[in-house]
A protein has these predicted regions:
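Short glycine/proline- and aromatic-enriched beta-strand/turn motifs that initiate or cap beta-hairpins
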Residues: 21-74, 182, 186-190
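Polar/charged side chains located within well-ordered beta-strands of beta-rich proteins
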Residues: 35-37, 63-67, 92-96, 149, ...
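Outer-envelope beta-barrel architecture signal
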Residues: 24-33, 61-65, 104-110, 140, ...
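Predominantly the C-terminal beta-signal and adjacent terminal strand-loop region
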Residues: 72-74, 144-190
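Gram-negative (and chloroplast) outer-membrane scaffold detector with strong preference
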Residues: 54-129, 187-190
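Residues that define the transmembrane beta-barrel architecture of outer-membrane proteins
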Residues: 29-31, 45-51, 82-90, 106, ...
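Extracellular loop and loop/strand-boundary signature of outer-membrane beta-barrel proteins
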Residues: 38-41, 76-83, 130-136, 168-172
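Cleavable N-terminal export/targeting peptides
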Residues: 1-28
Length: 190
């Protein structure tokens, strides 16, 4: 019995402390599903957040394309009442990998995306509680985003994402630029 225990300990030690083999990552044709979310416009209010879902595919030279949808909710204060701006956007973009570690566990990418969507202010209700009327209304949006993203492989099929993003959307009535800080999870499906 003691001999079996020592052989088990030796096998585990060899498995843990010998060189590791990593699965191939960032191969052309690999695809993943992303779930992401975070803070929008800083973390000034509890209602300033975004969430989204995307599909990404890897190309030659370890770059990738992204197509997805996002929901952003931002809070504006008016006389101690929240006026909400909600944006529903679709995204199509391309990310260039410019840094990775030798073990292919960490990847840093920069990307640009085209965005199109719809914005609603105070869910279409233009009359405020005190009788004043909102000048900002619902509108269609168009623009783009610049993203810096860090990908960390937790396993060969599960990836943790961290990103900083600046969105510029025209057509709305409440400002053009929105900064986002977020985390995400990507599942490699192919």
């Amino acid at each position: 019995m003691r001999g079996v225990f020592y052989m088990f300990v030796a096998a585990v030690s060899l498995a843990l402390f010998s060189g590791q083999a990593y699965a191939q990552r960032y191969l052309p044709g690999m695809m993943g599903v992303e779930l992401r979310g975070g803070f929008a416009g800083g973390s000034k209010g509890p209602l300033n957040y975004y969430t989204g879902m995307a599909m990404s595919g890897y190309t030659k030279k370890a770059n990738r394309w992204v197509a997805g949808a996002e929901y952003l909710l931002k809070n504006y204060n008016y006389r101690n009442v929240a006026v909400l701006r909600a944006q529903f956007t679709a995204e199509g973009g391309y990310y260039l990998k410019f840094l990775s570690d030798p073990s292919k566990t960490l990847f840093l990418s920069i990307g640009g995306s085209a965005l199109i969507g719809y914005e609603t202010v105070n869910w279409g209700d233009r009359m405020m509680h005190d009788g004043s009327r909102l000048l900002a209304g619902d509108a269609f949006l168009y623009g783009g985003a610049l993203t810096l993203e860090l990908e960390t492989y937790i396993t060969d099929r599960v990836v943790l994402l961290a990103n900083i993003r600046e969105r510029a959307l025209w057509g709305g009535s409440l400002g053009v630029f929105t900064t986002q800080f977020g985390l995400g999870l990507k599942i490699i499906i192919h």
